Amino acid sequence: MGNNKSGSEDNHKVWEVNESSKCPFMGGALNKTAGKGTSNRDWWPNQLNLNILRQNSSLINPMDDGFNYAEAFKSLDLNAVKQDIYDLMTNSQDWWPADYGHYGPFFIRMAWHSAGTYRIGDGRGGAGSGQQRFAPLNSWPDNANLDKARLLLWPVKKKYGKNLSWADLLVLAGNCAHESMGLKMFGFAGGREDVWEPAQDVYWGAETEWLNNDERYAGEELENPLGAAHMGLIYVNPEGHNGNPDPVEAASYIRETFGRMAMNDYETVALIAGGHTFGKTHGAADAEEYVEAEPAAAGIESQGLGWKNTFGTGNGADTITSGIEGAWTDTPTKWSNKYFDNLFKYDWECIKGPGGAYQWQPKDNAGAGTVPDAHDPDKKHAPFMLTTDLSLKMDPEYEKISRHFYENPDEFADAYSRAWFKLTHRDMGPIERYLGPEVPKEELLWQDPIPKVDHEIINDSDIASLKNKILNTGLSVQELVTTAWGSASTFRGSDKRGGANGGRIRLAPQNGWEVNNPKQLGKVIDTLEKIQQDFNESQSGSKKVSIADLIVLAGCVGVEKAAKTAGHELKVPFSPGRADASQEQTDVEAFEPLEPNADGFRNYFRNRDHVSASAEELLVDRAQLLTLTVPQMTVLLGGMRAMGANYDGSKKGVFTDRPGQLTNDFFKNILEMGLTWKSSSDSETEFDGSDRKTGDVKWTGSRADLIFGSNSELRAIAEVYGTDDVEAKFVKDFVKAWDKVMNLDRYDLK
C-alpha cells in the first residue's frame, strides 16, 4: 500500500487547516446545531417525560449562589416602589398610548391573567413564579398585547432589579392600579420568586389549535384539572361558549371555570363586575386581517413583541386585542358601582362590533353619547356588555348576587377586594410565606390556617422517650410509615398547600380518603393521640407535643426500625415544631382536590374511567408536586416497597422475601434476568413476574413498579441502587429523601 503512487500522493496531500476553509471530513453547509434534529420524543411520542423532575436547575439561574429573594424583597421601600408605579401609570407612552391616559385597567388585566391560570385541581398555574413572561402564556390569545404591559413596567423592574421579582411586580402593579383608581385593597404580599424557564409540568390541554376545545370536553364535563373552557383562554369565551352569544349557557361555563380556580358564585360575581368596572376591550377591526404573529412566533427583530397590528396606527384608537370593542361605564378609570347600574338599567341586544365579534349594546340607542372615548375627547359612545357580563343578570343565582351588590356598594367593594386578594395570592401557600408591610392580619379559611405554636417544643430527651413509646405500641412498620407518608405527601409544590403541618390527616376529608386506608389510619391516630394525651398531661410546664409532630415522628420510628432490622443503625432526622389545625380551620371542599387519584409510592391507583394517564405518568406527576428529583423518586419508591408500605398492605411491588426491612431488594429483583413479566389484567395495569425456568409466579407488580426496569433513564438509576455494594448508600439516600418530604411545608426551617 505504501508503494502505491496514488496512495503516496494522497498521503502527501494531508489536509492542513491553513490551506483550506473547508475540512473534507466536515464538508457541507451547517444547517443544524446542538439540540436540533429528530428527537427521542419524535420517534417515541409516548415516552415517559422525566424532564418535569429537573426544572429550574441552578445551572440556569443567573443569581449568585446563596441569593435569598425573601431577604432582598424585605430591603425594599415598598411605598417608594408603589409611588413609581403610580407615576408610571399616568405617563402615557407614544409607542403604546394609555386608554383614558391611565394604564391602570391594562395592569389589572395583566395581573389578573398572571394569577388567573391557577387551578385548584393540581395547584399549578398562577402568579407565583412570573410564568407570564414565557411561552406558552406570553403568546396565548387571551394574553394579547400584555407584552406591552410588561414592557411598560420595565423602568420599575430596572430600577429595583433583583430586589423585586417580575412575579411580585406583576401582582403589585395590579394592586397599585386599583388604588390609583380609588379602591382600597385588602392587602398585598410579596415573596414570589422568579423562575428562568417555561413550566414543563403544567398540562394546558391536548388541543393543537388556539381557542379550540374539542379535546377537553367529554360531553359537558371539562377535563380535570383544566380550568379554562378553550385552549389559550384564561376562563371562558367572552362572546359565549364556542362563540354562541347565549348568556344563560355561558353562565354554566363561568361557574365551572371559576370554580376550578377555587371561586364560589359570590366571589365570581364580585371579580367579573369589579374587573369590568375599569377600562375597555379592544376590537377596532378584524384581528384575522390585521394582526400578525404572537411573541413566540414573531421575528427576531420584534424583540419579544407580538401581535403587530397593521390597522391604522396599530395602537390607541386602532388597537385590536380581543376583537371586542367597548367600555362598560362612563368612568373607566374610577372605582364605582356603575357596572351594575348599567347592567340593570338597560335592556340589551346582541350585535357584532367592528372587530366582527358578538357583543351587546343597550336597546333603542339608549345610553348613546354617555361613555367617553379612550383617546379622542370629542367622541362619545354607548356602554357595552359582553355575553358573559349578561350572564350575571340572566343566570338566576348570579342575578341575586349582582342585585345584592348593586344595592350594597360598600359590600361589593369589600367583596371584590377580598376576591382579588384571593385570586392573586391563592398559590402562595401558608401565610408565613407572605412578605411585606401590607400582609393582612385577618386569618382566611382558604389560606389553610395552622395555629402558631404557643407552647414549649419537645427536646431530644422527649423525642427519645416518645419514640420508645411508639415502638412499644406494636404498630407495624407499614402502619407507621404509610400514616406519616399520607400526612406529608399531600404537599403540592405548585401552590404550597398540604403537608404534615397541621396534622390534617386526622380530619375530614383526609381521614376518609381511600388512599389513607381509613380503618388502619383510625387505629394509628387513636394510638398516637393516646401517647400525645399521656405526654401532655404529664408535663408541669408549657411543653406539649402536637399530633402533627407525633405522626411524622412515628414515620421516623418506622423507618429506623426497618433499617435496624436490615442491619443499619441510624437516626432519621426529626424537627419538631408542627401545630395541630382544627376541623373548623379546614375547608373540606377546598381540601378535596388534594385527594390523590394515584400515589405510586403507596402503589395506589384509583379506578376511575376518566383517568387516562398511565400509572407511571401519575407517579412522575406526584413526584413533581413533591418537588422530587429523579433519583429521589426512585430511592423513595424502592424503599417504600421494601418496607411493604402499600396503602392496603398488598404485596404488589414488594419484591423482597423480607418485607418491613429497609433494603435495596426492590431494585435487585426488578433487574433480575431470571424473571419474565406478563400482564395479568386486560388493562395492562398489573403484572406477574415468573421464574424463567419453572414458570412459577414469584412477584406481582404495577406499571409504577415495572417502569424502573423498562424506562432506560429510570433503569440507569435503579442499577445504581441494585448493586451489591450500595445498600448503605441506598439507606442514606432514602432517609435524606424521606426527611425532605416530611418537611416540605416547614417554611419555618428554610
Swiss-Prot record:
Cofactors: heme b
Which chain regions cross the lipid bilayer?
A: none
Q: Which reaction does it catalyse?
A: H2O2 + AH2 = A + 2 H2O; 2 H2O2 = O2 + 2 H2O
Q: Where is this cross-link: Tryptophyl-tyrosyl-methioninium (Tyr-Met) (with W-112)?
A: Y235-M261
Which SUPFAM superfamilies does the UniProt record give? Heme-dependent peroxidases
Crosslinked residue numbers (Tryptophyl-tyrosyl-methioninium (Trp-Tyr) (with M-261)) = W112-Y235
Any idea which residues are catalytic in this one?
A: H113
Describe PTMs of this protein.
Formation of the three residue Trp-Tyr-Met cross-link is important for the catalase, but not the peroxidase activity of the enzyme.
Family annotation (Pfam families) = peroxidase
- The EC designation for this entry is 1.11.1.21
Disulfide bond sites: none
* Residues given in the record as heme b binding sites: H276
Q: Where is this site: Transition state stabilizer?
A: R109
Query: What Gene3D superfamilies does the record tag this protein with?
Result: 1.10.520.10, Peroxidase, domain 2
Where are the coiled-coil regions?
none
Q: Which family does it belong to?
A: Belongs to the peroxidase family. Peroxidase/catalase subfamily.
How is the quaternary structure described?
Homodimer or homotetramer.
Function according to Swiss-Prot or TrEMBL: Bifunctional enzyme with both catalase and broad-spectrum peroxidase activity.
- Name assigned to this protein: Catalase-peroxidase
Could you tell me which species this protein originates from? Christiangramia forsetii (strain DSM 17595 / CGMCC 1.15422 / KT0803)
Q: What is the lineage of its organism?
A: Bacteria, Pseudomonadati, Bacteroidota, Flavobacteriia, Flavobacteriales
Which gene holds the coding sequence for this protein?
Answer: katG
